[in-house]
A protein has these predicted regions:
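Conserved phosphate/anionic-ligand binding catalytic regions in large, soluble enzymes, centered on
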Residues: 12-32, 131-146, 224-227, 236-237
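Glycine-rich, N-terminal phosphate-binding loop and its surrounding beta-alpha-beta segment
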Residues: 46-106
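Short beta-strand elements
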Residues: 12-18, 25-31, 83-85, 113, ...
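Flexible glycine-/small-residue-enriched beta->alpha junction loops
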Residues: 90-125, 166-169
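Glycine-rich, mobile lid/loop segments that gate access to catalytic sites or pores
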Residues: 115-223
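Short, hydrophobic/aliphatic alpha-helical segments
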Residues: 2-17, 119-121, 228-232, 237
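Short, conserved charged micro-motifs
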Residues: 35-40, 94-96, 220
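N-terminal, positively charged regions that mediate nucleic acid binding
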Residues: 2-61
Length: 237
């Protein structure tokens, strides 16, 4: 059966590719206008925020996640043709997953992949791994450059972790803590809460909020493809 569903967007089209324990992961972006200043450093800055091993509360896997632009950029500017980026995997330990080759993990996509395709890559979740988000983050970094040229800016942060919610909003504090919270006190409380969760072998949920400024009125349509529906499709996919 054909594996579809790896592309999102219509004007700005994003196609992610790769698996958690493959040689590399990446993304191809079609629809980026020509003349946008873009470098690997622009993308790397965002990838460094999501890379594993940089947060004590995330995965223990260590990856440099170094971005390599393969096409679509010349002399520091986009050419208007498809932009392809790649990040090599360097810390795969596939042997750690040998015991689940014939069993399914609760809460993962093991069973659904097997049921749909009759075959699955059990090493680290394969295509359903969180490392698939490398392509999304890289594409987001490029989209941010385009939006910046249009006067649109955004701020994303963690609003709550478990029962701990922010009470203040200081944007300058977002990058100063492991939770990207705009409230230093709330970040300390979230840290203590998660430390207890770890001791209890428990997990916790959270809420992320995004503020976008400079968006012109009238985006979206009144019936199908409403703006909130399109955003929901992106966020929930």
């Amino acid at each position: 059966i054909f594996l579809a569903g790896s592309t999102f967007g219509s004007i700005f089209r994003v196609t992610t590719w790769g698996e958690s324990h493959g040689k590399a992961l990446g993304v191809t972006i079609d629809g980026c206008p020509a003349g946008i200043a873009l470098s690997e450093e622009d993308i790397q800055a965002e990838l460094d925020r999501r890379k594993p091993g940089s947060n004590p509360y995330g995965t223990k896997r260590k990856e440099s996640d170094s971005a390599m632009i393969l096409s679509g950029v010349f002399e520091g500017k986009t050419t208007g043709t498809p932009i392809s980026l790649m990040v090599r995997n360097t810390d795969q330990r596939s042997r750690d997953y040998g015991n689940i080759a014939y069993s399914y993990r609760p809460g993962h996509a093991d069973y659904t992949f097997d049921a749909k395709y009759g075959f699955r890559d059990y090493r680290g979740g394969g295509r359903s791994s969180g490392r698939e988000t490398i392509g999304r983050v890289a594409a987001g970094a490029i989209a941010a450059k385009i939006l910046e040229s249009l006067g649109i800016s955004f701020c994303t942060y963690t609003k709550s972790v478990g029962p701990v919610s922010i009470k203040k909003f200081h944007p300058e504090e977002i990058a100063e803590n492991a939770f990207y919270m705009p409230d230093a006190q709330a970040a300390q409380e979230a840290s203590a809460y998660l430390e207890q969760c770890m001791k209890d072998h428990d997990s916790a949920g959270g809420v992320i909020e995004c503020r976008i400024n400079g968006v012109p009125a009238g985006l979206g349509t009144p019936v199908f493809e409403k703006l909130d529906a399109v955003l929901a499709q992106a966020v929930m996919s």
